[in-house]
Structures are given as structure tokens and as C-alpha cells.
């Protein structure tokens, strides 16, 4: 069982839970050395987990959930910076104790949409903290600008309007280069759903070569189309936190623009990737449903199950292919926002396999190079059905159902909760039956 360390609580009123995430090279003894620093400063570690870095294939990211006071944390933060390559520190309520006996080891997950405030700021990098190989690492003006965007995202709360950004000429020029080059490829590479929705975004959200759309405008557009909304985020989230947002039809979206020195490359998701890669398909009902179901399957799932779901998400929503009119077309956002890999994926030289979650979840995700294999689905509906079957294999002592009226998840774990859902379905079937009856009378059937 995971629980807060309550010892000496009266003598340390400023103690609290904080998440620290840092990167380690894949070498013997690295983790032991880092954890020894926590021991020396008497920092209690409540939870530890590791995952392969999304930025460097040779490194691992370590997440630790700490219970300590601010002075101890500041000391450990400074010590870690001299031993590891990336350090991020944020308040956390990521894990907690569940009261039901069969739920006590279930990781914390948001129950209502406002709970995303508790995990949306758990970014792996913050503001001006860039890797040494980042194109903007030596550009102090760019780093300052990145911190500005990060602060906006970190201060955002559910229900707030997304702040309007006055983009610089340099940022608009960078966006324009990406927009112009990608639009040359979309007619022959993008799926029909993407091509249908892109003109709507031009009309209603200001998608143009000389204009970067505002996230608030995009969020309102998506809300009317599929119920999805946009939430600004400062950078990478953990797979668990990102997928949790999808369960509530919330897409965490960056606002910063990639560095102008190399407009056709970015080592991380930026607003070009989000707006040109993801948004057009989030405006498609079937795709939106597919994305939400992956998110719902992740709630309360084990770390292993979440990683499998995240990998399936990566090879579908980010790098997925589909068949249309007998030809391969792209629907993955990572491809639709990358000129070189978009060309490669349909070049004939790329390796392609049918999408099968049981196989796909074992494939390695590559960040800095082209994928070794791409997975193709016959349709979004087929991909959705396969993911539904795969989700049934995830061991979880309850089911979940999203309630769009309260923007919360219903926990289905007893006959009472199941009966409530059955009553809702019965009412909806009555509506359908009544409509069919009226249609029959009109047709004199």
C-alpha cells in the first residue's frame, strides 16, 4: 500500500508531496548514486518508477514521489542537477490510498475534469530547461520565450480561457515555413478525414501561412465538433497523465513554436505539431471516440498496462496509417507534422504491418529517427474495435464510463453502478424506438 509518511507531521508543518523527475544514462550504479542523495538528505521516497526516455534512446527517466519539506527538496534538487542531465520538480497528488479493499493498490487517477489541474503540470521539462542538443539551447531570447509559454501553461486552471498569444514575426515565419511545405504533401498523403477538416479550421480558426491559430479558438471549434477541448501544457507529460486527459476529451497542447534555425525539425512537440498534426483529426467524431477510449482504458491501470496503451497510441494517433480507396494514407499526427517522415512513410521503402494491439504494444517507439515499422488499419472503426478488445485484457477491478453531462467518470464495480448505466441505456433505446416508430408511420410501413 502507498501512503503518506505521517511521522513527525506536527513538527514539520510544511511537509508535502512533490514529484521529481530526472534522467539517467543507462549505466551500472547510476540510480543507486542518485537515490543515495535522497537518503543523505533524509527525504522519504513514497513511490519510484522508471521509463525509457522519450528524448534520448540511451537514457532512462526516473520518477520519484517524495514526502519532505521545502528546504530538503531545494537541497536535493540542487544536488541532483550536478549529477543528472534533466531535473523537473512539481507538486503531486499522483498516487493515493483507495479506501476499498480491492482498490487499495490502484494508482490515483482523475475522477472529474477539474482533477486534471492536479496532474497537468507534471511536465518532464520546464520552460527554459532545454537539452544541450536542442536547437535553441544557446539562444537566451528563445529560452526566455519558452519560459513565458511554460508559465502560462503552469498557471492555467480548468475553466480558464486560454490566454491569447501575440506571436513574434520570427515565430510566424517559422510556422509559415512548416505550414507551406506540409500543405504541398497533404493532398497525396493525408487521409480523407484530415483533408475534410483542414479547410474548416482555415475558415473558423484562422489556419493560414501568415497566422498561428489561437488555442482558445481551436478549443471552441473542437468542442462544437466532437466535445474535445484544448488545455495548454508546458511540455512532455508522462504517458499516464497525458492519456488521462483523453478520457475527459481533453487534449494537452503546447503553445510554443520550434526554434527558427531549423523549422523542419523539432525534438519535442510544439504548436506546429499539435495544430497541424493532431487537431484536424480530433475534429473527426470517430477518431475522437478512438482517442477517448484509449484514455478511459488507462484510468487506474497498472504501469505496465499504461505503457502498452501509450505504445498503441504512439503507433496509431502519432504514426498510424490507414487504407482508403485501395491506397495507404496517413492519419498519425507525428507523420502529418514531419515533412521527411511523411514522405518516407508512403515511399514504398517503409515497413508496414497490420495494426494489432497485442503486437503493436511490444514495438519500440523511436523519437529521433524514423520508425522501424508503421501499422495500418482498414479504418478508424476497425482500430477502435481492436483497441476495445485489447482493453478488455487489462486487469482492473472495475470498469469506467464517461458522463458527458458532469464531465466525470463513473466507476462500475457493483450491481448498483451497473444498474444506473442500464437505466440510462434503456432511456436512450426508448428514444431510438420512438423515432423509428415515427419514421415508420411517415413511410406508412
From Swiss-Prot:
Its cofactor is Fe(2+). Residues 19-94 form the ACT domain. Keywords: Iron, Metal-binding, Monooxygenase, Oxidoreductase, Phosphoprotein, Serotonin biosynthesis. Its EC number is 1.14.16.4. The keyword Metal-binding applies. The modification Phosphoserine is found at residue 58. GO terms for biological process: aromatic amino acid metabolic process; platelet degranulation; regulation of hemostasis; serotonin biosynthetic process. GO terms for molecular function: iron ion binding; tryptophan 5-monooxygenase activity. PROSITE patterns: ACT, BH4_AAA_HYDROXYL_1, BH4_AAA_HYDROXYL_2. Oxidizes L-tryptophan to 5-hydroxy-l-tryptophan in the rate-determining step of serotonin biosynthesis. This is Tryptophan 5-hydroxylase 1. It comes from Gallus gallus (Chicken). The gene is TPH1.
Amino acid at each position: 500500500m502507498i501512503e503518506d509518511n505521517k511521522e513527525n507531521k506536527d513538527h514539520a508543518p510544511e511537509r508535502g508531496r512533490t514529484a521529481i523527475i530526472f534522467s539517467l544514462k543507462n549505466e551500472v550504479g547510476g540510480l543507486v548514486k542518485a537515490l543515495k542523495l535522497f537518503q543523505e538528505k533524509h527525504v522519504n521516497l513514497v513511490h519510484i518508477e522508471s521509463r525509457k526516455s522519450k528524448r534520448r534512446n540511451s537514457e532512462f527517466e526516473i520518477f520519484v514521489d517524495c514526502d519532505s519539506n521545502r528546504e530538503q527538496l531545494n537541497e536535493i534538487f540542487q544536488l541532483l542537477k550536478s549529477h543528472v542531465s534533466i531535473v523537473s520538480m512539481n507538486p503531486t497528488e499522483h498516487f493515493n490510498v483507495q479506501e476499498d479493499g480491492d482498490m487499495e493498490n490502484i494508482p490515483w487517477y482523475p475522477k472529474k475534469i477539474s482533477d486534471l489541474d492536479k496532474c497537468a503540470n507534471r511536465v518532464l521539462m520546464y520552460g527554459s530547461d532545454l537539452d544541450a542538443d536542442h536547437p535553441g539551447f544557446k539562444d537566451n531570447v528563445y529560452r526566455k520565450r519558452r519560459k513565458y509559454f511554460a508559465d502560462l501553461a503552469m498557471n492555467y486552471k480548468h475553466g480558464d480561457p486560454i490566454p491569447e498569444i501575440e506571436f513574434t514575426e520570427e515565430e510566424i515565419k517559422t510556422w509559415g515555413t512548416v505550414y507551406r511545405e506540409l500543405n504541398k504533401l497533404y493532398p497525396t498523403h493525408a487521409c480523407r478525414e484530415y483533408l475534410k477538416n483542414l479547410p474548416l479550421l482555415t475558415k473558423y480558426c484562422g489556419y493560414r501561412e501568415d497566422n498561428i491559430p489561437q488555442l482558445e479558438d481551436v478549443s471552441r471549434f473542437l468542442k462544437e465538433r466532437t466535445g474535445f477541448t484544448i488545455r495548454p501544457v508546458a511540455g512532455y507529460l508522462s504517458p499516464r497523465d497525458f492519456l488521462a486527459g483523453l478520457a475527459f476529451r481533453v487534449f494537452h497542447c503546447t503553445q510554443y513554436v520550434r526554434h527558427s534555425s531549423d523549422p523542419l525539425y523539432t525534438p519535442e512537440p510544439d504548436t506546429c505539431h499539435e495544430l497541424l498534426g493532431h487537431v484536424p483529426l480530433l475534429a473527426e467524431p470517430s477518431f475522437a471516440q478512438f482517442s477517448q477510449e484509449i484514455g478511459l482504458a488507462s484510468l487506474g491501470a497498472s504501469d505496465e498496462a499504461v505503457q502498452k496503451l501509450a505504445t498503441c497510441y504512439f503507433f496509431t494517433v502519432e504514426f498510424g496509417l490507414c487504407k482508403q480507396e485501395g491506397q495507404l494514407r496517413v492519419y498519425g499526427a507525428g507523420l502529418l507534422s514531419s515533412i521527411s517522415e511523411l514522405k518516407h512513410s508512403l515511399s514504398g521503402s517503409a515497413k508496414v504491418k497490420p495494426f494489432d494491439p497485442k503486437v503493436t504494444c511490444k514495438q519500440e517507439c523511436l523519437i529521433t529517427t524514423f520508425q522501424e515499422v508503421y501499422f495500418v488499419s482498414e479504418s478508424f472503426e476497425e482500430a477502435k474495435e481492436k483497441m476495445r478488445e485489447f482493453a478488455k485484457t487489462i486487469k482492473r477491478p472495475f470498469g469506467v464510463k464517461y458522463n458527458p453531462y458532469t464531465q466525470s467518470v463513473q466507476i462500475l464495480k457493483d450491481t448498483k453502478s451497473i444498474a444506473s448505466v442500464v437505466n440510462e441505456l434503456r432511456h436512450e433505446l426508448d428514444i431510438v424506438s420512438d423515432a423509428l416508430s415515427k419514421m415508420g408511420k411517415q413511410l406508412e410501413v
